[in-house]
UniProtKB/Swiss-Prot annotation:
Record's keyword annotation contains Signal: yes
One GO CC term on file: extracellular region
Transmembrane segments: none
Organism: Dictyostelium discoideum (Social amoeba)
Keywords noted in UniProt: Glycoprotein, Secreted, Signal
Glycosylation sites: 76, 110, 182, 212, 223
Biased composition (Low complexity): 25-47
Protein name: Uncharacterized protein DDB_G0289171
Span list, region Disordered: 25-49
Disulfide-linked positions: none
Source taxonomy: Eukaryota, Amoebozoa, Evosea, Eumycetozoa, Dictyostelia
Amino acid sequence: MIFKKTILIFIISFFFISISFASSSSSSSSSSSSSSSSWSSSESSSSPAPSKYIYAIAVIENYKQQQFLIIDPWENNTILSESLQLNFEIDDILIVEESNTFIVYSESTNQSLISINPNTLQSKLINKITPPIAGFEDMLQPSVFISEKKVLYKPVVDINGGGELSSLLRLDFESGKGTFVNISNENQISTAGSIPNVAYDQLNDYVFACYNSSNNNVLVAFNETTSDIIETYGILKNIQGFDVTMMFTDKLGNLFLVYQDNSGDVFVCEVDSILMECFGVFKYNIGTVPYAFSPYFLSRDKSSLVFITYIDENQFLLEVVDFNHGFKSKKTIFSNSYLNNPFNVYWVSLTY
């Protein structure tokens, strides 16, 4: 099982926010072929890069130092690097609001929702869960934060009662209450210690969960407001034997799963809930991953997948793949020179 590490941790969120700067302009990119039945690979564009920054918080030496970074990967430049003087540990960057205020999650002060002003670097507690929820192991799968409800879903392993069942922890920061959501049923019990995945369909107010049961991927949907199970779709037949690593919905509510094989290929497939199959729409090779972070995650606006892949000890390749427009992509190479040791980096937050 994968749990939080307390070595050099790099909590990083790639919030590609529309921040204007003079040297860039928006443009179209060349398309890659895609269909619902065949894999597509990304194709780069020669047009100018979008005007977007990387926002990151580097946590060094067991939280002795937390560093705030703004990086422009398209110009290969560090815009800002400031030390944060905080009395809590940041475990996840959830969103960056239009005002550029950070909303972060911390478990060092119960389960807390906190805002950080990027100009003053001052923090403010929004709310915390009282009493704190205990009896779980925090998993490094992507969380889902529903900002308009102030609700956070975290994939966890529930160790209450001596078991190790994968579950979802629902943290409601409006009410200050936290609950476990049981995503398995009596016929398909989740494999002990397996890592669940979660996605939110804002259009229909559904939460989708996917978990492993006896080497099968089981899909479940429930109502976010009531937590009532809407449907247990059952086993996705054509991806048996693969571990799903991420799931997401697009703006129309279509559900996508991400999984990878041992050769470094990452597959994105769209779920057909009638046929109970997941049809391949995109493939990306991440190659060898000599570092301890996930090289892909979802954009904040649900428009793109972002891939960070290793080139050499001094450089990373950033590629933004727009799945709402035929999987067109933008790519650039940026330096990791702002890190002390990139091979000791761990990315906890994979929001965007």
